[in-house]
Amino acid sequence: MNHIKSLHIEGFKKFVSLDVEFNEHMNILVGENEVGKSTILDAIKTVLNQQYRNADKSILRDLLNKQMVAAFEANPSVKTLPRILIEVELALDPKSKNADYFYGEVYGALKKQDEKFGIRFECRYDEALGAGMEQSILEGKIPYEYYNLTWMTFANNPYQMMR
């Protein structure tokens, strides 16, 4: 049965880094208020439904992890700019339609150079687009308008939500 196998989050809302493994049949998120249950669901929606695809870049203030923003402010540089990475690993039948579109080597956060099915969302500063912003960055300003939001499959294909 096709399902979400695992989730990796870096720099999204309250999570600096989080890995979640899912059960094939049923998953229940249980916890106190404000521990991140809804954030896990938002991360999945962000990847699969391309949530925020056409949103104003000012929304990034609410999406970037506050600890990562504080670390940037303490040591402002292009290398310390906060970013978001969310990877959803899928368990797909290799013979199913479009399975090859999602199958490829994983080089991202999972750091296992395995071949898996999945989709990766990345939100990061685009140095080429933001050429000339270095001084502003060194002053501790995050250039949200020069961030790119990209959705790619593990096969390095652009991901478009299937309707």
List each model region and its residues.
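Generic marker of residues within folded, mature protein domains
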Residues: E10-F12, D19, P76-T80, L110-K111, ...
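Pre-Walker A-like glycine/lysine-rich segment at the N-terminus of P-loop NTPase domains
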Residues: M1-Q50, S58-V69
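Short C-terminal domain-edge/linker segments immediately following a structured domain
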Residues: S38-I40, F72, I119-R124
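Electropositive, glycine-dotted interaction segments
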Residues: L85, L92-R163
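Short amphipathic alpha-helical surface micro-motifs
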Residues: M1-I4, I9-G11, N23-E24, I28, ...
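Conserved P-loop NTP-binding catalytic core
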Residues: A43-Q113
